[in-house]
Design a protein with these regions (language model features):
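Catalytic binding pocket for nucleotide-activated donors in carbohydrate/polymer assembly enzymes
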Residues: 44-46, 52-187, 191-201, 205-227, ...
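Catalytic cores of eukaryotic secretory-pathway lumenal/extracellular enzymes that build
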Residues: 1-40, 45-48, 224-228
Length: 238
């Protein structure tokens, strides 16, 4: 399923990037072999951080913190570190969507029937029809059939359940982006309030609350030759 989702992303990219109306406005790019080094190019350039994991179903990472520190605003669920980011920046500076962990648990307990949500969300049938028609697969109507069956059959990550809420949050993003002074203020607040996620704070708190380790002063006593001769090594510390 993961490989099929990647194929789906690239299929969307083929359509969007070939649309002349989108030229200079929007491009879809899949970053293969994503790692920290590549992230160093993405984090400073991002305006919006999409943290779309279903509440309670994903281990917390640090990518959302790095986006926040670089001034990107967050659209996300109450999952992982998103909760702490929202607490730091305030509700008005975070684009929240989706059910809570308790809401997901209740939905699962009641018996989740994703197919019943299709008719209640006007945009959802259109999206599913585009996928089913082969619009993103060069006319191949069967390529993404497993993806459709997964979504409409049992939807283990409750994607359809959070879809309408996500659209509303994206509308709020568009309105904020149109008001550039407001957006810039929100961006600055995200950076200014990211201190909670610094490694200094984390290590200090681990020392105090978990490791219960005391500070131990270290004194380095060695002479350093400020102008060493070529090929000459500095003396090692005792």
């Amino acid at each position: 399923m993961a490989k099929l989702i990647i194929r789906f992303i690239n299929g969307i990219a083929d359509v969007v990037n070939a649309d002349p109306d989108m030229d200079g406005r929007l491009r879809v790019i899949f970053l293969a072999d994503y790692n920290v080094k590549l992230g160093e190019r993405v984090y400073p350039a991002a305006d919006l951080s999409e943290q779309i994991s279903t509440a309670g179903l994903e281990a917390s990472g640090t990518g959302n913190m790095k986006f926040m520190m670089n001034g990107a605003l967050t659209i996300g669920t109450l999952d992982g570190a998103n909760v702490e980011i929202r607490e730091q920046v305030g509700d008005d500076n975070f684009f929240l969507f989706g059910r809570t962990t308790e809401g997901i648990a209740a939905l699962r307990h009641e018996g989740y029937r994703p197919w019943e949500l299709i008719a209640s969300t006007p945009e959802l049938p259109e999206v599913l029809h585009l996928i089913e028609s082969g619009h993103f697969s060069n006319g191949d109507k069967e390529l993404f059939r497993p993806l459709l069956d997964n979504l409409t059959g049992h939807d283990p990550f409750f994607v359809l359940a959070d879809f309408a809420s996500y659209l509303q949050a994206q509308q709020a993003v568009s309105e904020a982006w149109a008001d550039r002074p407001r957006w810039n203020r929100m961006s600055l607040l995200n950076t200014a309030r990211s201190g909670l996620f610094s490694s200094d704070r984390s290590i200090r708190e681990y020392c105090e609350r978990i490791w219960q380790a005391e500070e131990f002063p270290v004194t380095i006593t060695c002479e350093i030759d400020e102008a060493p001769a070529k090929g000459r090594r500095l003396p090692a510390a005792p």
